[in-house]
A protein has these predicted regions:
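A short, Lys/Arg-rich alpha-helix, primarily the initiator
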Residues: 1-21, 59
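Short, basic amphipathic alpha-helical segments that act as recognition/interaction helices
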Residues: 63-67
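Short, charged recognition helix plus adjacent turn
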Residues: 68-96
Length: 96
């Protein structure tokens, strides 16, 4: 197991670069990061960002980008075993 002991969130420019690299819209990035909508995503990427991305949000987004569908489903199954009720839908990114 690991505990994050230090975290500096990515800059707005880094997140904007990732969005361009993936060819995603703000709505797609919001879904990828597990945040409400494009308005929430834009709070992380605006010229004067209103929010810094939390470690948990960044972790969720990185997991979506790094894990295979089976690995991600395994994590969701573990969450369900812990008592969570989770429903998902496929997220299609331009690079897929």
């Amino acid at each position: 197991m690991r505990k994050i002991t230090s975290f500096t969130p990515p800059s707005a420019a880094s997140l904007e670069q990732l969005m361009k690299q993936l060819g995603c819209t703000s709505n797609q990035m919001a879904a990828l990061a597990g945040v409400k909508d494009k308005n929430q995503w834009r709070k992380y990427t605006g010229a004067n960002p209103m929010r810094s991305m939390s470690a948990t949000t960044l972790f969720f987004m990185a997991a979506q980008l790094s894990l295979s569908p089976d690995e991600f489903e395994r994590v969701l199954d573990h969450m369900r075993n812990l008592g969570a009720d989770i429903a998902t839908e496929a997220l299609s990114l331009p690079s897929e």
